[in-house]
């Protein structure tokens, strides 16, 4: 196991951005930045032993300072949408910025992935990033201290852990917004890649992709990934939730009941790469990019 640090560039306001490269004994590599605690690269050996970078990112700091698709980003304090850009915490309403129609998306516009995080090498295979989010930041109550760590194991696991401490009731709903294509950077589609999800239900959204409150069974619908099949097999089905989202962009109700367990799998027969996802979160968002070239599981 090894970690090396490289200079990646400089932000518009003159701050140095560093790239932390974690590498295991099998050649697998992950690169993370102190700008946004972003996962910038993930190189995985394919069936022939050739390394493929399976996450999308930018070649320079300027790309990450804008980062419209949130590539590799740590999103918080809240990931995804808040209807009407108003959240109720401990009986009090807090008004957020409307940055997605009438709603708030990813706690923007001042998002965590545009900020510089403090970084330490916590072990020979672990980098830890920390950020202080003051009371009122993004419209949320409470001073919050947030830690995100990346650990790369010799078993081929990239472990992402989130920790938050606040001095008031607040929301803490972070995610990593990486997009994956297991065929690597030269591929322009994920439609032939296969997905399995351990979920019996999902939460339909309205036209603004805000959950309606319904928990709907996936049985007999194109949302059912309990039996592995390709992303493209049903993505164009005549089904209202798919039409509203322009493909898959839905919250699945996992069967893990809040315990750490395998919840999903993405497979490429072409590259021979298989990615398994485990979590203790009760829900998982599955999202195909607008060009159907990438797949996110958060």
Which residues does each predicted region cover?
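An exposed, glycine/acidic-rich loop-and-rim segment of catalytic or binding clefts
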Residues: 1-289, 293, 298
